[in-house]
């Protein structure tokens, strides 16, 4: 390809990317981060932890903006003036108010106290991510690749998407046709090494837009007040005396 043609093609790509970015709204979310002192010491001090946290949030932002799957540009910004190192039980940090921030992220690489229960997303007015690893007495870095894949998944909850893996149906528990359903490919199904948001996740995140949301409220809000079921014969004519049975499926 001639050099002038190559330059023109590259310029066109840059202009197209800039136009797309300009056409999309930017949603900025302020994040307060706390980490346990033992992890800071194990990782080499505060400056090193700041660097690792910056790298982690670059990956979080990339996950939300990769491939322009969503209608907006997402920017999760750590407030470094509010960044803190805590002592004691990490579970005590989760429910602390953070009125000046959209989200609180509590990291814990040494989860050994019995009160330090499972990590994950805490919604319903708490708006916090408990970013902790295996419950044992050894150090588990919250900055490993799989750990960051996990926190991307938790930010998916923060933006309104429920666990897709919780919707799976085992074949022996499907009384309709006996088929299994394992869920679709998505960060919200199996996040490790995954970059794709499913169509369902994209629609939920887009629906949440720039609001701070609770998953249950968001899901309930998109359902109609009434659902009408029509039953037809093979020739598409309305069936008479049809019986419709609903089989509830509990999540998890």
Regions found by a protein language model. Give the residues of each.
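Residue-level marker of regulatory loop/turn positions in helix-turn-helix DNA-binding domains and
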Residues: 144, 148, 163, 180
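Hydrophobic h-region of N-terminal signal peptides that target proteins for export
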Residues: 12-22
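Propeptide-to-catalytic entry region of secreted or membrane-anchored zinc metalloproteases
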Residues: 23-147, 250-252
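Catalytic Zn2+-binding segment of zinc metalloproteases
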Residues: 149, 154-172
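Sec/Tat-exported extracytoplasmic proteins
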Residues: 60, 64-68, 155, 159-163, ...
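Bacterial N-terminal signal peptides that target proteins for export
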Residues: 1-10
